[in-house]
């Protein structure tokens, strides 16, 4: 049964990447004491060792024997199995089991072998195969080992099972009771494991299980071949643990030789659970969640088959160290071919075409022999490799020693050779006359060389032009001597890339041009006595004729069939090497005086072309012909000649010249610019201030200095403002501040003592000293300040009294207000009709005024106050008053609120305080006049006498206004039959806020509703007027249609109505 579980595991994991199961033969053997089954090292995926299927099954069986207690107690042969006689009894199994095949399963992994993850205690304990196997905690990282992975494509990073046959000869040579040893420490399963499995089963299924083991080993593998999609190893799916257990149990139950029963079902469950637990331990299964990783297999967790990931081969973001292969300049031509090219060039230069062909054939044969020798050495090294790591090292060494293939040129940049339309891949030359008849020779078409002129120009890498042998053969059918390049020899050393150029051979006679190329252009004249080709890389061309030109170097005289030779640079005298600026035809004019500018737009005509020297003309003609392509014939002298330059346009500025004038001096005087000499301001010498004496403390000095700097006036003007009571120069606020900061007697004494010395006082001390010198300064300032305060206080008190007086008078005498109250009385009696307590009223108390808005009608937006306002407006409309002329019948809400805030007792106290201050000011004025000298007495005396006279009248008027306002307020309360809430108070004791509190809300609500009603009435009248106009226009149009005659006025009205 355990064997069957192992086969199912091979089937599941083999579905992803593995070989099919193949039967084999085996020899019986007993498991030694050194078996690694105890610590599970043999079955770890990261160890990459081979495991026999029987060994795997015996491990599962041994683990099951100690798991289910119910089954163990019912097994009578348990003591024999677990005792010392277990191995002896195992050797006496049925001889039919000896024919059972031994299947070796190996965990294939791409990882390098790691060190053993088991502890030393586990390796010292010697256990029997049949002893209970406890499950140690899984070693750290057994599912995802951290060993560095190889980056070769030869190794595959998958965990799979590979089934192999064990050799029958090796197994038969071992004694029956001894375990064979192999290089890979493979343990062969013996019939002992099968007998142990039978011994652990219940008696009723022991025979069937033994027979099933024989049949399963010798015959064909039975069982269901169906694997669920999520359990497939190649599907990379996540599945629940119970799904795997159910599938394993179903495969065991599907076996026709397995008996059914409750005990058997429990054994199946235990065996499948232990089987999955071992799979998790060895690393085949990987738990997804990180919780309970140290526990065993759980059917309620999510699992996944362990797959090792493919190593990433992403290139580094920053360039690393360049190796020899990527050394600059890059060349994809093997050194063997370069040697052949050099040999062919030398032979062509010395002995002609025939000698070069013989040299190329000899070199090609030597290169082929060298390549075969290298291939034989490589085969021997590969055969001597015993592990995949060694094979991988050999392959890497081979790959690193071979040049990389030619890179594809980038589309974003072009080589300089392509821009110049020249290359060294194919070397040939046209004769200018075409008279000689020689066969044109080509170099090897597949020789890829670097363009020397492209170095440092194209940054995306060097590229070469690759031409196949077939294309070369089509282009030149007369080349029987062209030899194909031999296979590439081993990579040359680094010094081969920078070999010195060979000595140039004498140039051969130029061959005639091919028929399909037309007339070739004449080549540029080479320097005398020069060689034939630039130094390699690339190698020198076969044909001569071109020399090494001086810098800037032109291209070789033998361009490719798809390029042309570049023209040499023009003569520097022509100005084509550098951009020639447009020079002026006229010389600069320097007037004797600076003139006024004339802002015009200058036109500069080009200078006439200078005649060209004959030598320059000849060289230019030769360069023009040399720049053509070898595929194109030279331009003819007739119709193919380039068109001449168009004649210059005729302009007035090229025909006229400046006229000499006789009155240029007069012009200079008239239009010269007058230069104004800058006048420098005289520098004011700042007198450094001497040290000053500070008497005050720093805080006091700072406060006095702030007030002094805010005045911005000298002390003399301050003195004048105080003597003349002039607040236009010094503000009243500044005078108040000066009155507050006056020096005390102590400070003033210290300041006077410091002022007698040579060192001046500081500004704050000097300011206090100047104020103290003013006669009666503080008394004068107090009188001036009180004069301003008195006028302000009297004005405020008069306004309060006038507000209450005017409001009381309006409430008594307003006819509009009386109409409103009559409407309220009428509607109230109508609403209270039939009620003996509230009906038939002659008046109402003022507390109802604030409740009118709360009386709702059937319409939610209409209240009793709304109806009262509409009724008042309708009454005024009946009298013929226009809606815009209807006045608000009630007092202004703002006046009512101000009147409610006034208190007669408070006003009377304010008048009393003001009168007291006024009396003090009188005494101060008399004191100042008594202490002042006659010259400083005026105008202070006259102004203060005038103020005192006016203040006496104002105080008497205030007392009178207060009494009149109080009497009028009492009359108003009696007029409206007002009674205070507190019955103990009389009308004389009532305050304005108690009376006007009923009017405040009423006036605010009445005014808001009155504004809305007036606006609504005006809109309604506007609609009616527009409707009337429309009706009148319609009537006019009907009358015109009836009469048949339309006047001009009627036409205008019709047009307006239509618009």
Curated annotation (Swiss-Prot):
Database matches in SUPFAM superfamilies: Formin homology 2 domain (FH2 domain) (SSF101447)
Domain FH2 per the UniProt entry, residue ranges: 585-1032
Any single GO BP term: actin filament-based process
Residues spanning the membrane: none
Gene Ontology cellular component list: actin filament; cell cortex; cytoplasm; cytoplasmic vesicle membrane; cytosol
Keywords noted in UniProt: Actin-binding, Cytoplasm, Cytoplasmic vesicle, Cytoskeleton, Developmental protein, Membrane, Protein transport, Stress response, Transport
Residue ranges, annotated region (Important for interaction with spir): 1049-1059
Coiled-coil region(s): none
Name of the protein this chain belongs to: Protein cappuccino
Species this protein is from: Drosophila melanogaster (Fruit fly)
Gene behind this protein: capu
